Amino acid sequence: VEIDLASGKIVRTVNVLREPRSAVFSKDGKYLFVTNFLPAQRADLDYVAACVSVIDVNTFEKVKDIQLANGSNALRGLCITPDGKYVYVSHNLGRFTVPTSQLQQGWMNTSAFSIIDVENLSYAGVVIVDEPDRGAAGIWSIACDEKQIYITHSGTHEVSVIDHEAMCEKFEAYPDKSRLDYDLTFLYGLRTRIPLQGNGPRCMVTNENKVFIPTYFADVLNVLDKESLDLTSVPLNPDRTETVEQKGERYFNDAAHCFQNWQSCNGCHPGDGRT
């Protein structure tokens, strides 16, 4: 929806696919990239994945739906690199083609961010943010600057800080990008996982020097220094009392209760816990 700020009226609308969540403009202002939260297709096919819709800002028409890696769902975060070359999309990567008989090494669910080539409006590949023996469940927001990429993990209550330049160099040199879907070692030596205070970090805001990360289930604001990676935390509601319903929702989203933190209930039932 395009809204005239002066009048507050809707000027133009355009349909995407399903449950749009995030949006970002290309650096030249020509395109608007929009995440579709869930796949808009039958779920019993061999390839099931959500798409990023591309809107031509001038005509306000959808020009393309870019489908991500097989199993991509719960598309939440979206950002564009400072040079405008790539768009990063944070999402869950489900392994729906195998029986749900185990959890280790991301057998059922992994967390990832997909990379979209802005110039070609095409899917370039995906980066897994889990480790071989430890998941990074509940991936939510993603942001970047020239130096680093920042990702919140709502299920493991932490933020990942990734060496941006080194990641891009390794990604572009990777010989067969189709194998990235299962590469749990790609970020080895490139990423720092920083535990946060509180429970359930989701959205974040960045400025030149800091990353501000509130926690959804604890009313705690975490402030991360980009240079030193030092963390300070401020309780916003220290006398907060949790209801039974809130406790249940917190458990539903908490991967700390899962073997090696691979997933929470939200991993298979994203959004409002649909089944």
Write out the residue ranges for each language-model feature.
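Residue-level detector of Asp-centered blade-edge/turn motifs that repeat once per structural unit
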Residues: K27-D28, P82-G84, C144-E146, T206-N209
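A short beta-strand motif characteristic of beta-propeller blades
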Residues: K9-V14, E61-Q67, A124-P132, G189-P195, ...
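Conserved loop/turn at the beginning of each blade in beta-propeller domains
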Residues: V16, G71, G135, F186-L187, ...
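Short, conserved, GDST-rich strand-edge loop motifs in beta-rich repeat architectures
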Residues: T35-A49, V89-T110, E165-Y174
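The canonical Cys-X-X-Cys-His
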Residues: C258-D272
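Short loop/turn segments that connect beta-strands within beta-propeller blades
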Residues: D4-G8, D56-F60, V118-L121, H164-M167, ...
